[in-house]
Amino acid sequence: FASKNNLSLNFKNPFKNFTVNESYETISWYLTVLTRWFDYNDTFLAKEWAHPSDNFGAIFSYFYKNDKYKFIDFANALTKAYEIQGSLCLGTSLNKLGYDHVFYVKIASGSVFSHLVNKGDANATRRTVNNILLDGPSLRAYRHFPNVGKRKSWAAADASKRGIELSIISSYQDEIYESVQNEDKWGFETNFLDNSELGFGKDLNNWVIQNVLFKVLFPAEFHGQSAVEAAIELSDEFNQNINKLEKVNIYTHEPAVRIISNKDILKNASDRDHSLEYMVAAALLYGDLKYEMYEESFQGFEKINNLRKKIFVTEEPQFTKDYYNFSKRHISNSIEIVYNDNSISEKITIENPIGHPSRRAEAVPLMKEKFLRNVKSIFDTEKASEVWDKIINLKKDDNLNVFFNILIENE
């Protein structure tokens, strides 16, 4: 996509690639892809799943080209996008009908961008949302065997870019398509949702952005993060008794069974980081989980593949109830090891992985470590820590130029 948009990529500092002459769509696409590529995306789990940070590129693109604002204006716009996407996820499932969650990115990014670029014109925003409904959602087939592929890494960028395109088109006087959501024959709900209602699962405020999940320690689909933690706790015992192994039992919530329990052939790393059995096998064997463990070139690849065949996943109904309980929102997993002499290890249960709102205090220092580790080829530790601290200490009334200068001045 870089050559298509005539960008000269600067991986030391991607923000140096942009000028105010770049289109909103280009900036949004680029940053949304990079957020996923570098694994900085957050997560929100409900009836539908989401990475609300997928909206960052679209919101950033507007303020980067229109920087006479305060930091609080940027933060408020981002909060609105998070709230729209997350509340839709609480209200209506797309995945059960085979559609991908990035459709809600298109709605959230498109509607907030429209509000910004059209200076609060309600009709323009209505046109934007209804044009997005007319587009419809994409299939999520590229996230599942046998069609897993790299599209899952750029699907959100595509959605945010399209949301911006439709918001700009909708700036012009045109039909609003008032009844497209619920019209009986040709409407969105009739044709895409099997007559279910598209709606918010709660009142809109700022709750979603305060309750996202941060991927802190492990490169794994979030429904399996607590299982990886549990497996690491059992790793020493597992390796001491590996010759006695009969099987490994995982007890989990229904969404994990449906999404990431996969003992089939795993064709690539994208398949493997969405296999509960694979990630737990790696964590049991090596007491950790790193990106390279998903690659066929990893020296322990065959060991992991052989072990996952002995891992069995079962739904624990209470975990499913706690997953959907609005006051808990647990992402629980239990693991036990069964040996061939009929003995069983301690069952390790982790209700919420690091990165869950209930463990925020543990997560923030680890997030800083992740940042320092990921930029060590560019900045020394002192410089990286300085960049982190400057961003964390931004004040709401700071001019946005202060924010942008932090990003641009560091080479």
Cite the ranges covered by each PLM segment:
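Generic structural signal for well-ordered alpha-helical scaffold segments
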Residues: 63, 114, 232-236
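Glycine-rich, mobile lid/loop segments that gate access to catalytic sites or pores
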Residues: 64-161, 165, 180-185
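Well-ordered alpha-helical segments within folded domains of soluble proteins
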Residues: 53-60, 105-112, 160-165, 224-228, ...
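Long, structured ligand/cofactor-binding scaffold of large enzymes
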Residues: 34-76, 80
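Short connector loops/turns at beta-strand edges and beta->alpha or beta->beta junctions
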Residues: 35, 54-56, 64, 83-84, ...
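Hydrophobic alpha-helical transmembrane segments of integral membrane proteins
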Residues: 50, 54, 101-105, 270
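Terminal-appendage/accessory-domain detector
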Residues: 1-48, 147-161, 168-411
